């Protein structure tokens, strides 16, 4: 049987994708001398928030996710960010490949909410691998499964996430609301003659007694 191991070389924002995408550069090694014909790879990516420190401002921004900091000993737990998959071509010994991770700016998604709450530093990631490895030997092709015991850690710079979002949503964010709520907001904006959504939200904040930008 093959013995594979994975490491994350680096991460970067992908500027030419159809949707916001972070590209993880991975290295895979086969330690038993088998020639790998192909690798069908699945990857579960988890965020491990307990593996980093937070500033006072970050603690406030993450209150909705984790509660008061006195509760963080219980609430700061790893959570799923996303699932991705890819294929790796033939290699002997080792090779490097890109793993594209499509991202969302939807703040109803835990991963996006957490990442938006970070000002700087790193995002602690854990990659859990599964899939199928295809090898070729004297008796022909063989296929064997990968187990979830294969994993790799990576400290992705927060700057990578922010740089990626700036590429696709420059100086802006994105929220999801129900259609009835959006219709009501459109009427509010039209009745008051507000030319932009920013001005509509600023007007609502002022009416609620909150400071605007």
Predicted regions and their residues:
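Low-complexity, acidic Ser/Thr/Pro/Gly-rich terminal tails and inter-domain linkers that flank the onset
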Residues: 1-23
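Internal, hydrophobic beta-strand segments that form the core of beta-sheet-rich folds
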Residues: 42-48, 96-148
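Surface-exposed, Lys/Arg-rich phosphate-binding patches that contact polyanionic backbones
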Residues: 179-196
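Short, basic amphipathic alpha-helical segments that act as recognition/interaction helices
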Residues: 195-213
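Short beta-strand elements
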Residues: 60-69, 134-174
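Short aromatic-acidic-glycine turn motif
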Residues: 46-57
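Extended, solvent-exposed segments with strong compositional bias
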Residues: 61-116
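Contiguous beta-strand segments within globular domains
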Residues: 15-28, 37-45, 101-105
């Amino acid at each position: 049987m093959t013995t594979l191991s994975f490491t994350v070389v680096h991460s970067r924002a992908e500027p030419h994708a159809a949707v916001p995408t972070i590209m993880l550069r991975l290295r895979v090694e086969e330690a038993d001398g088998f020639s790998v014909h192909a690798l069908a790879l699945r990857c579960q990516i988890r965020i491990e928030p307990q593996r980093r420190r937070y500033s006072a401002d970050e603690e406030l921004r993450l209150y909705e996710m984790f509660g008061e900091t006195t509760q963080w000993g219980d609430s700061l737990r790893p959570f799923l960010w996303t699932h991705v998959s890819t294929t790796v071509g033939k290699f002997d010994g080792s090779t490097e490949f890109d793993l594209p991770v499509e991202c969302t700016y939807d703040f109803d998604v835990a991963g996006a909410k957490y990442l938006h709450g970070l000002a700087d530093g790193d995002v602690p990631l854990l990659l859990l691998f599964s899939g199928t490895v295809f090898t070729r030997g004297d008796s022909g092709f063989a296929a064997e499964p990968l187990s979830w015991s294969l994993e790799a850690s990576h400290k992705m710079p927060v700057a990578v996430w922010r740089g990626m979002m700036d590429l696709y949503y420059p100086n802006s964010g994105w929220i999801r609301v129900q259609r009835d709520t959006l219709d009501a907001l459109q009427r509010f904006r039209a009745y008051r003659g507000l030319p932009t959504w920013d001005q509509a939200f600023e007007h609502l904040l002022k009416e609620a007694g909150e400071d605007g930008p």
